[in-house]
Amino acid sequence: MSGHSKWATTKHKKAVIDARRGKNFAKLIKNIEVAARTGGGDPGGNPTLYDAIQKAKKNSVPNDNIERARKRGAGEEAGGADWQNITYEGYGPNGVAILVECLTDNKNRAAGEVRVAMTRNGGNMADPGSVAYLFTRKGVVTLDKNGLSEDDVLAAVLDAGAEDVNDLGDSFEIISEPTDLVAVRTALQDAGIEYDSAEASFQPSVSVPVDLDGARKVLKLVDALEDSDDVQDVYTNVDIPDDVAAQLDAD
């Protein structure tokens, strides 16, 4: 899940990845296949493919799985589905806005699974455009602090188009326009700074703070959505205050 809260974007995301390693592998593999099909099979000339491969490697996806996905997408090897990108919009508990990005070979199945997850967990589907306007597409690069200060990171990426550097506790998050994502990632590499992930993401323009009960309900809905094999990413505008995050940590 991606949202406004430090806790929601770090601890919860890692917990979901740990709990659903197999599903996550499949989703990362799909990203590689689609990136290779769209922009060609050479990571050197296809930044989206490069970043998809890097993300898969950092999540311990075996190299031969990565290479087979790249070959399928590039047409060098038979197989591969006709993946389609679809975005669904909805509202969760407490009026939290939700965007659900799917990558599927069956639109009807994807729509059905998203709808069921929403309705069973206090959410409801919304008309196209009625939620999307609350989010802006941005480039997001995350990296562990590893002794770096915010100024160290800013100095490396400011001239590359970085708009903001957010302190997430154990890590930094660099925000840019999606078109500057490759430049920001390259600037970090040139400065000898390792990063965790670099991808286009939806950032909320307005956030909705929730109490403990609201946070639990929203996260339960996000978990249900992410359980679907067709769902790649879930974005929300939930803001989980620090005191609520501390209570969630204690659960």
Swiss-Prot record:
GO terms for cellular component: cytosol. One of its GO terms (molecular function) is DNA binding. Pfam families: TACO1_YebC_N (PF20772), Transcrip_reg (PF01709). One of its GO terms (biological process) is regulation of DNA-templated transcription. InterPro entries: Integrase-like_N, TACO1_YebC-like_2nd/3rd_dom, TACO1_YebC_N, Transcrip_reg_TACO1-like, Transcrip_reg_TACO1-like_dom3, YebC-like. Gene3D superfamilies: 1.10.10.200, 3.30.70.980. It is found in: Cytoplasm. Keywords: Cytoplasm, DNA-binding, Transcription, Transcription regulation. The keyword DNA-binding applies. Its main location: cytoplasm. Belongs to the TACO1 family. This is Probable transcriptional regulatory protein Mflv_3828. It comes from Mycolicibacterium gilvum (strain PYR-GCK) (Mycobacterium gilvum (strain PYR-GCK)).
